[in-house]
């Protein structure tokens, strides 16, 4: 009898261990670099809380959309709201009412210790761009939201041609603030959470409100995901007070938590 009980106990231990293994999952995530600094800090916290490990691929939202449309898949897409809407329309993702979890605007940075120009008004910002020897922003040809918007903004301000000869672009998925640190540009303009993640810069401030572009970040479950429950848990985690505190520290504005979370 004791041998039988021991065998049953061993089987029970094995089944419990297997149940624990089943619960833990690797969540494949495609994420825009706009929230990279925040998610790099939050991913291990989520894993510690749930046992589920996010495996994150970083790129611009535009690049990730192209990859998904070409046939790649992920359990969770963390993109700009505009990009997620494209994939949802194509039936590549499913986005719920809690899709949007944070937003951010664009900001200007200089090399650490360098003089900070006045950018408090649209006219002052325009003059700061004209006075700069070189500026850096994301290449609009790469499809990044901030680069596309800022190129159009230069046209709107009437200085696009004037800025062409003194504009530098980082490589795709790169950060324009790195060009400032390297001495290749006087000013860098990019999403605030992206430039805040670079060492060796000083924040000048956000673009004037009339010129700024607010980007919403959203998450959706990839079509055909085998880890939909774990991915859904990660979306809920992005609305938690712990996550919201991290977003604020990285230059993001947390979205209001949806009801029931």
Annotate the PLM regions.
Residues 1-10, 17-21:
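Bacterial N-terminal signal peptides that target proteins for export
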């Amino acid at each position: 009898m004791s041998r039988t009980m021991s065998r049953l106990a061993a089987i029970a231990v094995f089944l419990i261990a297997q149940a624990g293994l089943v619960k833990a999952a690797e969540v494949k995530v495609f994420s825009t670099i706009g929230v990279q600094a925040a998610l790099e800090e939050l991913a291990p916290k989520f894993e510690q809380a749930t046992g589920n490990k996010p495996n994150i691929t970083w790129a611009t939202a535009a690049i990730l959309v192209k990859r998904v449309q070409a046939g790649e898949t992920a359990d969770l897409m963390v993109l700009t709201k505009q990009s997620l809407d494209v994939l949802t329309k194509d039936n590549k993702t499913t986005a719920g009412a809690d899709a949007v979890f944070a937003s951010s605007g664009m900001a200007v940075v200089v090399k650490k210790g360098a003089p900070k120009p006045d950018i408090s008004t649209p006219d002052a910002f325009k003059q700061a761009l004209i006075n700069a020897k070189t500026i850096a922003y994301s290449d609009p040809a790469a499809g990044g939201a901030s680069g596309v918007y800022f190129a159009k903004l230069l046209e709107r301000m009437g200085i696009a041609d004037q800025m062409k000869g003194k504009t530098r672009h980082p490589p795709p998925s790169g950060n324009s603030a790195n060009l400032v640190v390297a001495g290749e540009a006087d000013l860098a303009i990019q999403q605030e959470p992206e430039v805040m993640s670079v060492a060796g810069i000083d924040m000048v401030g956000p673009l004037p409100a009339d010129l700024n572009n607010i980007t919403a970040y959203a998450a959706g479950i990839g079509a055909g995901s085998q880890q939909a429950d774990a991915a859904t848990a990660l979306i809920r985690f992005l609305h938690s007070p712990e996550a919201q505190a991290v977003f604020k520290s990285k230059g993001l504005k947390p979205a209001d938590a949806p009801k029931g979370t």
